[in-house]
Regions:
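Amphipathic alpha-helical packing segments from all-alpha helical-bundle domains
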Residues: 72-76, 105, 121-147, 156-171, ...
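Amphipathic alpha-helical segments used for helix-helix packing
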Residues: 103-121, 138-139, 205-211
């Protein structure tokens, strides 16, 4: 029937779109956004360059879509981790550790998505990612304050500072080499973040015991 043919075509188009984005993500993880070129993405995805252009008229369109999908993946991971926690402070800790673990697992990709210099027209997508991260952390901070688990503070400002702390501590030029000591880095950064928010005894409370390590994290 015609509608079945239409459904099959739609599935093929969606699968090709996903393959192109997956190829771009792999390349960005290997060489950064500068390495994401139409020709290299087409070759990795097993399609012609013209096919990529049919989906994405310009390279900036491809990278903007890639940034949006990376942001969706990371925000989704934070929400799932926080949603499985028993309380607001545990949820905040879980969100911090999840972001840190995933960033360490794909450090080159994280740098490409958040901090690597890009064309001016891509700044909006990158800023949206940072704002989404800050909003997620802000929601967890607000919930913890409301239940008396954190001292009163400006949740928006605290979330912005937390986002900056994590980015600089994990993928910025001053970030330490985490090779071979990923668990230590994730726990140390989480403890630092929680202390900055007013939790001096986070380790004693067991807030960093269930650290999910980069090798254990799987993309959704």
């Amino acid at each position: 029937m015609p509608y079945r043919r239409t459904e099959n075509v739609a599935r093929r188009l969606a699968a090709r779109h996903d393959a192109i984005i997956a190829a771009a993500r792999q390349i960005a993880g290997e060489g950064g956004m500068a390495a994401v070129q139409i020709a290299s993405v087409a070759a990795r995805a097993g399609v012609a360059a013209g096919t990529v252009y049919r989906y994405f008229p310009a390279k900036t369109d491809l990278i903007a879509t890639l940034l949006e999908e990376i942001a969706e993946d990371e925000i989704g991971a934070l929400r799932r981790a926080a949603g499985g926690a028993p309380g607001p402070l545990s949820a905040l800790s879980a969100a911090i550790m999840t972001f840190a673990a995933r960033a360490l697992r794909e450090r080159r990709l994280a740098f490409a998505a958040i901090a690597e210099p890009v064309d001016a027209e891509l700044d909006a997508a990158r800023l949206a990612f940072r704002r989404s991260l800050a909003a997620e952390f802000g929601a967890r901070i607000t919930a913890a304050i409301a239940e008396g688990r954190l001292p009163e503070q400006d949740a928006g400002m605290a979330a912005a500072a937390l986002t900056g702390l994590l980015i600089e501590g994990l993928i910025g030029p001053l970030a330490p080499d985490a090779s071979g000591r990923e668990r230590e880095v994730v726990q140390s950064l989480t403890l630092t973040a929680l202390r900055a928010l007013g939790v001096a005894d986070a380790r004693a409370r067991g807030l960093v015991v269930q650290t999910v390590m980069p090798a254990d994290v799987r993309a959704p």
